[in-house]
Amino acid sequence: MSATDRMGPRAVPGLRLALLLLLVLGTPKSGVQGQEGLDFPEYDGVDRVINVNAKNYKNVFKKYEVLALLYHEPPEDDKASQRQFEMEELILELAAQVLEDKGVGFGLVDSEKDAAVAKKLGLTEVDSMYVFKGDEVIEYDGEFSADTIVEFLLDVLEDPVELIEGERELQAFENIEDEIKLIGYFKSKDSEHYKAFEDAAEEFHPYIPFFATFDSKVAKKLTLKLNEIDFYEAFMEEPVTIPDKPNSEEEIVNFVEEHRRSTLRKLKPESMYETWEDDMDGIHIVAFAEEADPDGFEFLETLKAVAQDNTENPDLSIIWIDPDDFPLLVPYWEKTFDIDLSAPQIGVVNVTDADSVWMEMDDEEDLPSAEELEDWLEDVLEGEINTEDDDDDDDD
């Protein structure tokens, strides 16, 4: 699925332009001189992105530890299509330049000219980027900008399991709250149960962080028993222990797949399309709140409390979007949803046509309480608040 299709339908006119603008997020400002230590990279004009075809693909794979391939349709003849493809190439060229010393390569696979190669490599979604590392293939579902792609690939280069060996690392682990995380306690790296945990981690790397400890003191603070694995849902303080330890790779993978949709989850640039595509029967409950803003912070804390109280409800999933993370999309969202993102908002969005209904807040200075939010969410889940009713009102 193409980048312009993922956050909504092709029929939404402003979306294509908004996401095209996002392509330039990673490009440097020309004419701005960086001081030593803050010298942003500028494209040096060297071609590093390879056109991968039947003749060279085997050699290309041998050359790089990690290879990112953009599977694309041939650009159309019109100027806009040609320009967009050139921009995408430049973004990949800059990322390739930055990561050249890390053993990361970039390539293009044409869906028409190189269809046979695409089939051999398992490339199925046109306008998607696939990342190859060893035996693993990762589909990149994030913002197409150089900085986000580079950050993602640096994470790919890291080991799939991070070890917790002391108090500071434990504190850093505990400070992670806005994403799913797992941690297990094992005897050593040679343990067969740790190997199973590591193999499972590779299945979700780098989207879901896996941690492990071999330190009994760390395990005691986490109340972990030997070969036990705890699963933390995003924004939840208490973990769920994967049952029936010791667990096989298959058991761990199945558990994560079953529980990976958190009650409250944050839309992030590196995984924005994956999150948006994971809708609930064609709708999303979406909350906008700036964490750095006092009202946004207060509203977010209320959302967390509601999510924690309703974590057992499989039908409830709220996507939190911090507008500060997506400045170029703010005007589009405000126009499409007819809302003011200078204040917190929560609503229901239809992913097919971007129709939406937003919670009415009686007093702009008085944010909704947890009880009021729960009542509103209950009405949404029961179908009393939905985007179809909003369409009927518009017709009237």
Curated annotation (Swiss-Prot):
Gene Ontology molecular-function annotations: calcium ion binding; identical protein binding
Native source organism of the sequence: Homo sapiens
Sugar-bearing residue positions: 350
Membrane topology reported for the UniProt record: Peripheral membrane protein
Pfam families assigned: Calsequestrin
Protein name per its UniProtKB record: Calsequestrin-1
Residue numbers of Phosphothreonine PTMs: 124
Job of this protein: Calsequestrin is a high-capacity, moderate affinity, calcium-binding protein and thus acts as an internal calcium store in muscle. Calcium ions are bound by clusters of acidic residues at the protein surface, often at the interface between subunits. Can bind around 80 Ca(2+) ions. Regulates the release of lumenal Ca(2+) via the calcium release channel RYR1; this plays an important role in triggering muscle contraction. Negatively regulates store-operated Ca(2+) entry (SOCE) activity.
Disease: Myopathy, vacuolar, with CASQ1 aggregates: An autosomal dominant mild muscle disorder characterized by adult onset of muscle cramping and weakness as well as increased levels of serum creatine kinase. The disorder is not progressive, and some patients may be asymptomatic.
Expression by tissue: Expressed in myoblasts (at protein level).
Lineage of origin: Eukaryota, Metazoa, Chordata, Craniata, Vertebrata
Signal peptide start and end residues: 1-34
InterPro entries with a match to the protein in the record: Calsequestrin (IPR001393), Calsequestrin_C (IPR041860), Calsequestrin_CS (IPR018233), Calsequestrin_middle_dom (IPR041858), Calsequestrin_N (IPR041859), Thioredoxin-like_sf (IPR036249)
Phosphotyrosine carried by residues: 43
